[in-house]
Amino acid sequence: MKAFLGFLLLSYLAIILVHDNVNCIIFGIFDPCFYKISSKISNDYSSMQCSHPISYIGYEMFIQKWKDDNYWPLIIRHCCFYLVFSIAFASCVAFAIRRNLHLSTTMKLLGLLSILVWLAQPVLNQPFPT
């Protein structure tokens, strides 16, 4: 169980480092522009400080990652959340086994737990106040 939780933690850490939102400075046709770009959804961006917001498509613009980004608080927050989620998941399964619950009841509990995790994602991805 400990090895599984360790593997889960490390794999999620790798996913966060590769697939999380990236803050970029985009040098385009106009003045430099600060964007927050999601690598999860193609062409999904939000303008942070742009006088002329335009979509990024392909290699039309040079994208440079900000040098002063600090992802560790976000990574720690995600890892702690998923550690608590893993404990809740294991507790739910143990509770179902101990009480001899039917499979449908157990699946309803796990489904509810998954919905709660899904609803918590926007809160987890909120940036820390500076």
Swiss-Prot record:
Transmembrane segments: 4-24, 75-95, 109-129
Disulfide bonds: none
Compartment(s) where it occurs, according to its Swiss-Prot or TrEMBL record: Host membrane
Membrane topology (UniProt): Multi-pass membrane protein
GO cellular component terms listed in the entry, alphabetical order: host cell membrane; membrane
UniProt keyword annotations, A-Z: Host membrane, Membrane, Transmembrane, Transmembrane helix
Role description: Plays a role in virus cell tropism, and may be required for efficient virus replication in macrophages.
Family statement: Belongs to the asfivirus MGF 110 family.
Protein name: Protein MGF 360-1L
Natural source organism: African swine fever virus (isolate Tick/South Africa/Pretoriuskop Pr4/1996)
